[in-house]
Amino acid sequence: MSDNKTSLSYKDAGVDIDAGNALVDRIKGVVKRTRRPEVMGGIGGFGALCELPTKYKQPVLVSGTDGVGTKLRLALDLNKHDTIGIDLVAMCVNDLIVQGGEPLFFLDYYATGKLDIDVAAQVVTGIGEGCIQAGCALIGGETAEMPGMYEGEDYDVAGFCVGVVEKEDIINGTKVAAGDALIAVGSSGPHSNGYSLIRKILEVSNADLTEELNGRTIADHLIEPTKIYIKSALKMIAEHDIHAISHITGGGFWENIPRVLPEGTKAVVDGKSWEWPAIFNWLQEKGNVDTYEMYRTFNCGVGLIVALPKEQAEQAVALLNAEGENAWVIGKVAAAEQGEEQVEIR
């Protein structure tokens, strides 16, 4: 072999192992702040260990995985990365609470073409904040530097969460019946859904993201992190007979509410029971979006819809509002004919 040939390294190929190690050192404090007593060991191992909480008699594991979609593009364009991790945690843990699950631990996957330690640390710090809000431990993750797969320093994130629920307390919608009340729990904005349409609206309307709407810029409204409902929802579940919970995500009202309704029932939603947050009216006007399409794409100000006996609705609303949520009675469950749509907005 010729001596004058250059010796190549992994770094020459675009993968900086030292940068990855530096990132791990930066985020150790974040991970420590999320720790739960069930977690065994620290980060850096091949796998993470977590015991089941001893308070459960027949524990059932609940799992979920999600991303934040094209809201990431907005974060990249705004160079604002400190809250996208909250979105990531929220999209996973809010799916767990639908079945009554208490989140136990969370793992993240961060992939990029070229690792920017500062940006990645901001993202993971946001993930840690989301885990604190949800009461779960950030126990591990993967940072993948993949030159040629992503443009420049663009990145993508995915999250994985595991929770636990008592077997006899699983919420699965089978108890939903005509006459149940429907409670809405307000959202913080578009959350992490509908951003491909949002970006199209911004493009065709040539919108100014620095424009102010109700004292905040359009950019601030759109990048607002997804609300995490875990602590207030767990308290509600503990004190009330919850029949179903729907997380209003991609597909809006039309797609998500029927997922928790048994055959022969429908949700009758009072469209006059709340005012859409201003950002949704702005999006509808700028994009000339039909109202049906708005309800099919966005949460329109509603993050969760809860079904429960009507005699418990008033107390549940009061509990949620005392916990800092914005909750109200949004409608009821009614009998549905065969083939009838399961969501009716009046």
UniProtKB/Swiss-Prot annotation:
Its EC top class is ligase
Q: Which family is annotated?
A: Belongs to the AIR synthase family.
Q: Which reaction does it catalyse?
A: 2-formamido-N(1)-(5-O-phospho-beta-D-ribosyl)acetamidine + ATP = 5-amino-1-(5-phospho-beta-D-ribosyl)imidazole + ADP + phosphate + H(+)
What are its E.C. numbers?
6.3.3.1
Q: Which GO terms describe its cellular component?
A: cytosol
Annotated compartments: Cytoplasm
Which protein, by its recorded name, is this? Phosphoribosylformylglycinamidine cyclo-ligase
What molecular function does GO assign, one term? phosphoribosylamine-glycine ligase activity
* Pathway(s) where this gene product acts: Purine metabolism; IMP biosynthesis via de novo pathway; 5-amino-1-(5-phospho-D-ribosyl)imidazole from N(2)-formyl-N(1)-(5-phospho-D-ribosyl)glycinamide: step 2/2
Q: What is its main location?
A: cytoplasm
Q: Which PANTHER family match?
A: TRIFUNCTIONAL PURINE BIOSYNTHETIC PROTEIN ADENOSINE-3 (PTHR10520:SF12), TRIFUNCTIONAL PURINE BIOSYNTHETIC PROTEIN ADENOSINE-3-RELATED (PTHR10520)
| Pfam families in alphabetical order | AIRS (PF00586), AIRS_C (PF02769)
GO terms under biological process? 'de novo' IMP biosynthetic process; adenine biosynthetic process
SUPFAM superfamilies hit by this protein:
PurM C-terminal domain-like (SSF56042), PurM N-terminal domain-like (SSF55326)
Q: Which UniProt keywords apply?
A: ATP-binding, Cytoplasm, Ligase, Nucleotide-binding, Purine biosynthesis
